[in-house]
């Protein structure tokens, strides 16, 4: 895997990650040491397929969606285990929704660091979807820091 990222993009990613204000020793180490492999994963998470057909967020978004749904299911099971399965499923769909992910992405200004191709840049109809999908990919990248042996 090519882990080369130009210096300007590297600094943009680091500045963005610092803005998240994550207080984790491992996270701070990665940022301070400019761990190229991990930062490449963040670059991938923040790149739309219209900009790069090979290095983009699609795989991370796919796994991110699964991890979020599993985490939400686990939380709901532990917290609201007396609810019917149908009600728990409805609650999960509210917790892990494109609307929530878009709101999260907007709150952290993720759109400022997403690399998009010209077609996606001009497509206002897919703007929120891209923000939601990128947020999922970012979440998985953050999880990858704490569990780097995972296959994603």
Locate the predicted segments by residue.
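Extended, intrinsically disordered, low-complexity regulatory regions
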Residues: 1-55, 104, 108-110
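Alpha-helical ds-nucleic-acid-binding substructure associated with the helix-hairpin-helix region
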Residues: 90, 97-116
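Acidic, Mg2+-coordinating catalytic module of metal-dependent nucleases/exonucleases
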Residues: 129-143
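Histidine/acidic-rich helix-loop-helix segments that form or flank divalent-metal centers
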Residues: 110-131
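Active-site catalytic microenvironments for nucleophilic, acid-base chemistry
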Residues: 74-79, 107, 141-142
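Single conserved hydrophobic/aromatic residue that forms the stacking wall/gate
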Residues: 144-152
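Active/ligand-binding-proximal structured segments within catalytic/core domains
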Residues: 55-96
């Amino acid at each position: 895997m090519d882990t080369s990222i130009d210096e300007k993009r590297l600094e943009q990613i680091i500045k963005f990650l610092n803005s998240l204000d994550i207080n984790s020793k491992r996270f701070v180490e990665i940022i301070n040491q400019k761990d190229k492999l991990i930062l490449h994963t963040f670059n991938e998470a923040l790149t739309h397929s219209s900009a790069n057909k090979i290095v983009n967020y699609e795989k991370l978004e796919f796994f991110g969606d699964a991890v979020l749904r599993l985490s939400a299911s686990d939380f709901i099971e532990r917290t609201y285990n007396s609810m019917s399965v149908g009600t728990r499923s409805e609650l999960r769909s509210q917790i892990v929704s494109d609307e929530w992910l878009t709101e999260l992405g907007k709150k952290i200004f993720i759109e400022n660091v997403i690399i998009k191709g010209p077609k996606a840049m001009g497509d206002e109809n897919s703007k929120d979807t891209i923000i939601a999908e990128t947020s999922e990919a970012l979440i998985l990248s953050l999880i990858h820091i704490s569990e780097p042996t995972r296959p994603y």
